[in-house]
């Protein structure tokens, strides 16, 4: 259990976990300000199919916003890389799935690692934020004067776990990672599944179209769920459809 002063739904399970089973495995990556709670529904389904699961709690998460503000995207990437090698020490076939910022880290890893994932699942990937340029500039300016700003929707009813506020510096790190990933996407060679929600107010529309244009070496499959928001794997309106589709993609890849 985490510190209730920092997190929404601190009673939920959100720590790192590694579940060693068969030689088929997957690395699951949560989003910015979240915890591993957001990927546990998928982990549960794959675990029943005897998959090995690795799900790290990214640096600066599950502790405090102050701690998150001292981390950068390279800290997260290094941690993800270490977990990827650990997974591949045990597995013959390895995949990766990421939600939101975790999707960016999944793309970074898929492009640059010598041992590349057999398939990539991106759930509401933060490739393009629903954030105009003037807001980006405002975030950069505000980061010199304050460290956090509140979220409009704290997701209490969603069974989502994470910080109730944004770290301005962490958002800027996310944008830096986003810019890098957009440059290296043409290096992708794996099959990709993209899950997008029609009610997602965080991610800009057309992520799957963007990937299809840039990742010409990959086959990109898209699932669009009109009623889904930014957390399709947790939302009751979408999870019963989205989770089986993800599992089906992974089993066939």
Identify the role of each PLM range.
Residues 188, 194-196, 200:
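Short beta-strand/loop motif that positions the catalytic acidic residue
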Residues 201-207:
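Conserved alpha/beta-hydrolase "acid-adjacent" motif
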Residues 121-130:
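Active-site nucleophile loop of the alpha/beta-hydrolase fold
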Residues 228-239:
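Catalytic histidine-centered segment of alpha/beta-hydrolase-like enzymes
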Residues 98-102, 106:
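Gly/Ala-rich beta-loop-alpha elbow adjacent to hydrolase catalytic centers
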Residues 47-65:
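Conserved alpha/beta-hydrolase
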Residues 167-185:
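Active-site nucleophile elbow and catalytic-triad environment of alpha/beta-hydrolase enzymes
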Residues 33-43:
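The serine-hydrolase catalytic nucleophile loop
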């Amino acid at each position: 259990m985490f510190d209730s002063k920092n997190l929404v739904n601190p009673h939920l399970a959100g720590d790192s976990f590694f579940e060693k089973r068969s030689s088929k495995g997957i690395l699951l990556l949560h989003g910015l300000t979240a915890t591993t709670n957001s990927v546990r529904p998928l982990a549960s389904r794959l675990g029943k199919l005897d998959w090995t699961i690795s799900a790290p709690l990214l640096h600066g998460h599950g502790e405090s916003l102050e701690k998150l503000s001292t981390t950068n995207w390279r800290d997260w990437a290094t941690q993800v890389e270490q977990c990827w090698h650990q997974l591949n020490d045990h597995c013959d076939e390895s995949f990766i799935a990421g939600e939101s910022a975790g999707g960016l880290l999944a793309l970074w890893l898929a492009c640059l690692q010598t041992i590349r994932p057999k398939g990539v699942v991106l759930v509401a990937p933060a490739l393009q934020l629903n954030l105009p340029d003037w807001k980006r500039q405002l975030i950069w300016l505000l980061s010199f004067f304050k460290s956090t700003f509140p979220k409009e929707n704290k997701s209490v009813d969603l069974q989502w776990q994470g910080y109730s506020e944004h770290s301005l510096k962490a958002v800027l790190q996310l944008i830096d990672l986003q810019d890098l990933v957009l440059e290296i996407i043409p290096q992708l060679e794996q099959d990709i599944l993209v899950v997008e929600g029609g009610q997602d107010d965080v991610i800009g529309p057309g992520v799957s179209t963007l990937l299809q244009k840039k990742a010409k070496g990959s086959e990109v499959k898209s699932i669009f769920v009109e009623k889904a928001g930014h957390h399709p794997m947790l939302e009751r309106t979408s999870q019963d459809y989205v989770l089986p589709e993800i599992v089906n993609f992974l089993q066939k890849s």
